[in-house]
């Protein structure tokens, strides 16, 4: 394989640039040429493809976001979009692709491989919701950013004797809420993976003020449960009479310089992706499990360790869907009592 390409797709995540840098420099060391694809699959279809060299990826290791930019492009799920993208890849002499992104990005990598273009997926999302890996690129940075914000919110919460509901990103996964909540000493953490009783939430707030002689209360809410304002309204309906405020950390969690951990795992995965393509291997996703690099087929059977399967109707289903660590949820309950 003489020329490969790299793209970032879906929501941006700190560490994506580190992965791109590793792909480029590892490929060059292996005597391969590398192209960057701007704006993910949209840029592939439109032919927004350009050569990359070592100088082009210098000074991006510590930058947040993705210098290749990203875009959601649902049209690539259709055969017409895939064929247009493949036409552009052939036009630029590209023989393999490294795809950095989430579930939807993996589906695109799977389709490319089916059409004869080996593609390797790297888990790039702050949500940490990709199957086949303990950690995704960007998750550690997002947790650090959220924890820093929660520490600051606790300061003002204490100063004014208030209850705060802090909504954090994560899509349908509660990992960011859980990890940052424990790190910040949250009084309650509400995540999609674990049911909650709003009356119990309110009772915990009241008990915290009364029995613990605390003058403030911090609740971390994963966006996959509901929005913060809606949750606060439920609390008021259930009898909460505290001085309640709502804060949504929003997209701040996607930005900022990646942590050393995110830089290292992104570099590790990016370099390994090149090794797989050099061997002509595609249709694989790289992950980290028990601090070791692992590879899983993107499409296949659950028994074979594949991340996704196809139903008889041709629908893509997730094998062994990701779940937040509920033992961590139990830990938080023990520590907040």
Curated annotation (Swiss-Prot):
What are the entry keywords? Allosteric enzyme, ATP-binding, Cytoplasm, Glycolysis, Kinase, Magnesium, Metal-binding, Nucleotide-binding, Transferase
Organism domain of life: Bacteria
UniProt cofactor(s) = Mg(2+)
- Keyword Transferase tagged: yes
Query: Per the record, what are the reactions this protein catalyses?
Result: beta-D-fructose 6-phosphate + ATP = beta-D-fructose 1,6-bisphosphate + ADP + H(+)
Q: Where is the active site?
A: 127 (proton acceptor)
Organism lineage reads as: Bacteria, Bacillati, Bacillota, Bacilli, Lactobacillales
> Its pathway?
Carbohydrate degradation; glycolysis; D-glyceraldehyde 3-phosphate and glycerone phosphate from D-glucose: step 3/4
* Record note on quaternary structure: Homotetramer.
In Swiss-Prot or TrEMBL terms, this protein is called ATP-dependent 6-phosphofructokinase
- Origin organism is Streptococcus mutans serotype c (strain ATCC 700610 / UA159)
* Family matches, as InterPro entries: ATP_PFK, ATP_PFK_prok-type, PFKA_ATP_prok, Phosphofructokinase_CS, Phosphofructokinase_dom, PKF_sf
Task: Detail which positions bind ADP.
Answer: 21-25, 154, 185-187, 214-216
């Amino acid at each position: 394989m003489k020329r490969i390409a790299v793209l970032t797709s879906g929501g941006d995540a700190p560490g994506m640039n580190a992965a791109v840098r590793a792909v480029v420099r590892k490929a060059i060391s292996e005597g391969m040429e590398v192209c960057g694809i701007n704006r993910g699959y949209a840029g592939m279809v439109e032919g927004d493809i350009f050569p990359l060299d070592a100088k082009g990826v210098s000074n991006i290791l510590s930058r947040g976001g993705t210098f290749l930019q990203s875009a959601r492009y649902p049209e690539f799920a259709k055969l017409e979009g895939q064929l247009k993208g493949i036409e552009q890849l052939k036009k630029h002499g590209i023989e393999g692709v490294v795809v950095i992104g989430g579930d939807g990005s993996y589906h695109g990598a799977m389709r490319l491989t089916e059409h004869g273009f080996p593609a390797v997926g790297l888990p790039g999302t702050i949500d940490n919701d990709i199957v086949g890996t303990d950690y995704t690129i960007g998750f550690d940075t997002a947790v650090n950013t959220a924890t820093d914000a929660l520490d600051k919110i606790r300061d003002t919460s204490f100063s004014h004797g208030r209850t705060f509901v802090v909504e954090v990103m994560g899509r349908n996964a509660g990992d960011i809420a859980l990890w940052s909540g424990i790190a910040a000493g949250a009084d309650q953490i509400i995540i999609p993976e674990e049911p909650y009783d709003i009356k119990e939430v309110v009772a915990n707030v009241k008990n915290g003020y009364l029995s613990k002689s605390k003058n403030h209360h911090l609740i971390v809410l994963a966006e996959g449960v509901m929005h913060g304002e809606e949750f606060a309204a439920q609390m008021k309906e259930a009898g909460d009479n505290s001085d309640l405020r709502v804060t949504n950390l929003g997209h701040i969690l996607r930005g900022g310089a990646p942590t050393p951990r995110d830089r290292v795992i992104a570099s590790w995965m990016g370099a390994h992706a090149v090794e797989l393509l050099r061997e002509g291997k595609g249709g694989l996703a790289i992950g980290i499990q028990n601090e070791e690099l692992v590879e899983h087929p993107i499409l296949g059977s659950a028994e074979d360790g594949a991340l996704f399967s196809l139903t008889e109707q041709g629908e893509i289903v997730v094998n062994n869907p990701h779940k937040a660590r509920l033992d961590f949820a139990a830990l938080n309950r023990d520590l907040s009592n």
